[in-house]
Amino acid sequence: MNTQDVINIFKQADAILEGHFILTSGRHSATFLQKAKVFMHADLTEKLCRGLAQEIKRHVEGKIDYVVGPAIGGLIPSYETSRHLGVPSIWVERENGVFRLRRFEVEKGARVVIVEDIVTTGLSIRETIEALVAVEADVVASACIIDRSGGKVDVGVPLIALAEYEIVSYTRDTLPHELSKIPAVKPGSRDI
């Protein structure tokens, strides 16, 4: 599966939105990838996550003990990807604003791969790494369906992307004039 295949799946689900969006990262963009519109279709989700699992197998040497997803956005892709890898899926969730592994225990040194939906700045992956390092897990890699940075983001471990699809994003201070005229919508899940 290549980048165009992934984009075609998003188009098939009407999941590429145009307007003025405040991303989960806090950055602004004229394009939003509404992965919920893809994930509501099990067949499309299965295709993407099967492809992501194949990429993980190609890039990660050795055993994987767990796939870990950051709640909320990483829950569905991490679960479906773990199914294709044949390993358990667990997740981190926010407690007082900080990701924690609350419902699960992992063995010291357990080899884990973090699976996220869409990466822009990599903050959720970095916060997930912190939570896993705190319980002495070995984060061997991270993976995502789409890397919006076009391969530029550094999350601290290898990032395996099913697709790199660079979409320009802006800080509030650097918004183009035409985008600043459009009312902003915040469809992400960071503050939930």
Curated annotation (Swiss-Prot):
Keywords: Glycosyltransferase, Magnesium, Pyrimidine biosynthesis, Transferase. CDD domains: PRTases_typeI (cd06223). InterPro entries: OPRT (IPR023031), Orotate_PRibTrfase_bac (IPR006273), PRibTrfase_dom (IPR000836), PRTase-like (IPR029057). It holds the Pfam family Pribosyltran. Its EC number is 2.4.2.10. Disulfide bonds: none annotated. The keyword Magnesium applies. GO terms for molecular function: magnesium ion binding; orotate phosphoribosyltransferase activity. NCBIfam families: pyrE_Therm. Belongs to the purine/pyrimidine phosphoribosyltransferase family. PyrE subfamily. Catalyzes the transfer of a ribosyl phosphate group from 5-phosphoribose 1-diphosphate to orotate, leading to the formation of orotidine monophosphate (OMP). This is Orotate phosphoribosyltransferase. It comes from Bartonella bacilliformis (strain ATCC 35685 / KC583 / Herrer 020/F12,63). The lineage of its organism: Bacteria, Pseudomonadati, Pseudomonadota, Alphaproteobacteria, Hyphomicrobiales. The gene is pyrE.
